[in-house]
């Protein structure tokens, strides 16, 4: 087979044999590091991988050849938890955070999520589209090729749908692949204050059926937290969403452990998000149900909290984990997955191999894209992040700098030295 594109002489390729399930426990520590590696691409797919000189049959008169001495290649990075589409920003809350005002106290004062809800409700489709596109561009420049994007800053049907429509439009227009999550249950809207059950009934009866019918989202999510939605309320919504055919995610055990992990395990959610306050029993329940733990260390960093999710304990117990930005305007205003990956080492005490497995193959399972992306594997799409680094440890050791040299998306050179092509 003659390749369309042949990428050669990488210092290292980060490869693994996809076992057919998210990596857990000791599997997280394993990878195949190919020295002097090459990748052959044809029709957007990886068709060959190896070390040294490529087979002669891969090279034809039209084959594009590129050498990458001094560089490494990983699968395209996957950010599997973002709140991508929103109006406004919340830098005016930063001084309060520095003064020690808590996230929940800011929310109780009418700030936080509810502040962004007001800004998003007043934002036009074009405004939301352009703002979200800028964030996606930034993510792409940092090596991200697949992104999960939630609604949840409308809390009414008109605005929630506008958010989902923005995600759908960007999925068509932007190089990054988007996976949509419906999260109208992100907070209790002011018009339903004191009556969350009535709001959940509106979501179940009036919103979810339309989201499903119009294929606007693949996943359904809810914020199970003190002063937001209880475990029983979360179970009520997610069980109905599951009956309609949605895959499930749940924000759980972020600020307090109130039973969200139990709901995730009972309903076999694909992932439980945050988990800073998870208990040993909660870890065991998620392992038993095969739920992926999606950890968001940049949120803990941004909130200036001391308690990070117990990632080391999770992996050692046999749990599958991922890492994501939680990109949002309040608790985590960043879109930089390289920073998150570095926090995975510095604050969660993971190794570079564990982090790379978390943000590639496990993240692919978290967004139900494991058949297409998540590993440098023959037959998968050629989503490739190329780092200006001599080995896979270097991007973690040399922190707070964008080390992306190039990005390939579906076999096409999409980013080249800081420029989107």
UniProtKB/Swiss-Prot annotation:
Residue numbers binding N-formimidoyl-L-glutamate: 153, 328, 330
Gene behind this protein: hutI
Record text on cofactor binding: Binds 1 zinc or iron ion per subunit.
Major site of localization recorded for this protein: cytoplasm
EC top class named in words: hydrolase
Pfam families (UniProt xref): Amidohydro_1 (PF01979)
Record organism: Streptococcus pyogenes serotype M4 (strain MGAS10750)
Domain of life: Bacteria
Positions with a binding annotation for Fe(3+): 81, 83, 251, 326
Stated name of the protein: Imidazolonepropionase
Keyword Cytoplasm in annotation: yes
Binding annotation for Zn(2+): 81, 83, 251, 326
Gene Ontology biological process terms in this record: L-histidine catabolic process to glutamate and formamide; L-histidine catabolic process to glutamate and formate
Binding site for 4-imidazolone-5-propanoate: 90, 153, 186, 254, 331
Keyword tags: Cytoplasm, Histidine metabolism, Hydrolase, Iron, Metal-binding, Zinc
Function: Catalyzes the hydrolytic cleavage of the carbon-nitrogen bond in imidazolone-5-propanoate to yield N-formimidoyl-L-glutamate. It is the third step in the universal histidine degradation pathway.
Cofactor(s) needed by this chain: Zn(2+); Fe(3+)
């Amino acid at each position: 087979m003659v390749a369309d594109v042949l990428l050669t002489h990488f210092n290292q390729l980060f490869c693994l044999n996809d076992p057919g399930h998210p990596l857990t426990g000791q599997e997280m520590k394993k990878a195949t590091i190919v020295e002097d590696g090459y990748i052959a691409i044809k029709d957007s797919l990886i068709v060959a991988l190896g070390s040294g000189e490529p087979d002669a049959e891969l090279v034809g008169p039209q084959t594009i050849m590129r050498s990458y001495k001094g560089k490494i290649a990983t699968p395209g990075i996957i950010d599997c938890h973002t709140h991508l589409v929103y109006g406004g920003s919340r830098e005016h809350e930063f001084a309060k955070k520095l003064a020690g005002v808590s996230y929940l106290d800011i929310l109780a004062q009418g700030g936080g999520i509810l502040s962004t809800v007001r800004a998003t409700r007043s934002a036009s489709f074009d405004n939301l589209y352009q703002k979200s596109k800028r964030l996606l561009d930034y993510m792409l420049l940092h090596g991200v090729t697949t992104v999960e994007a939630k609604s949840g800053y409308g809390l009414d049907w008109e605005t929630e749908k506008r958010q989902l429509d923005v995600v759908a439009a960007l999925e068509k227009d932007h190089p990054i692949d988007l996976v949509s999550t419906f999260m109208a249950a992100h907070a209790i809207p002011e018009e339903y204050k004191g009556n969350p059950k009535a709001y959940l009934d509106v979501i179940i009866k009036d919103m979810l059926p339309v989201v499903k019918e119009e294929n606007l989202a693949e996943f359904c999510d809810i914020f199970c937290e003190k002063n937001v939605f209880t475990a029983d309320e979360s179970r009520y919504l997610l069980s109905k969403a599951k009956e309609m055919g949605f895959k499930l995610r749940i924000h759980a055990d972020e600020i307090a452990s109130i039973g969200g992990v139990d709901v995730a395990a009972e309903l076999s959610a694909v992932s439980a998000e945050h988990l800073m306050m998870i208990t040993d029993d909660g870890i065991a329940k998620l392992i038993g149900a095969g739920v992926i733990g999606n950890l968001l260390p940049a949120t803990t960093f941004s909130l200036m909290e001391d308690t990070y999710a117990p990632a080391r304990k999770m992996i050692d117990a046999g749990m599958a984990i991922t890492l994501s930005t939680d990109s949002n305007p309040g608790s985590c205003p960043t879109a930089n997955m390289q920073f998150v990956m570095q926090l995975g080492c510095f604050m969660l005490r993971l190794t570079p191999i564990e982090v790379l497995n978390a943000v590639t193959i496990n993240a692919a399972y978290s967004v139900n894209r494991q058949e297409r992306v998540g590993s440098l594997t023959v037959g998968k799409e050629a989503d490739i992040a190329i780092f200006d680094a001599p080995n896979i440890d270097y991007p973690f050791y040399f922190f707070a700098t964008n080390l992306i040299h190039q990005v390939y998306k579906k076999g096409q050179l999409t980013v080249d030295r800081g420029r989107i092509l």
